[in-house]
């Protein structure tokens, strides 16, 4: 899918291109493009982490009568919360880059997106350990 920007340049919004890092030598110039690339990396890294946690919960609670349902609900709520936060923080990062007049390399979008997931993991574990 391609969207046309205000300066009549084409913005590439292909999920396959973002995830395969095809865009060697290109830069992300528009706010939409920066937000989309950062958000997709945050989305898929969060999906990977929550998928692994869900499988672990499902295996550990398989003999529990309501364990499967509880694990699905917990993983779903955690994933939706992290994706909502990723939308907001991706827009903030892209906005800062845009206001500063900087272009973003595709690898920077990867670092920002996966970095959001890593920070979410660190904050989540520190909050859990504080309650024990």
UniProtKB/Swiss-Prot annotation:
Membrane-crossing segments per the record: 38-58, 69-89, 105-125
GO BP: negative regulation of canonical Wnt signaling pathway
UniProt-annotated glycosylation sites, renumbered to this chain: 12
A GO CC annotation given for this chain: plasma membrane
Listed InterPro entries: Transmembrane_pr_170 (IPR019334)
Membrane topology: Multi-pass membrane protein
Keywords: Cell membrane, Glycoprotein, Membrane, Transmembrane, Transmembrane helix
Ranges per topology, Cytoplasmic: 59-68, 126-132
Keyword Glycoprotein: yes
Major subcellular site: membrane
Extracellular side: 1-37, 90-104
Subcellular location: Cell membrane
A matching Pfam family: Tmemb_170
Domain of life according to the entry: Eukaryota
Family: Belongs to the TMEM170 family.
Subunit text: Interacts with CTNNB1.
Protein name: Transmembrane protein 170B
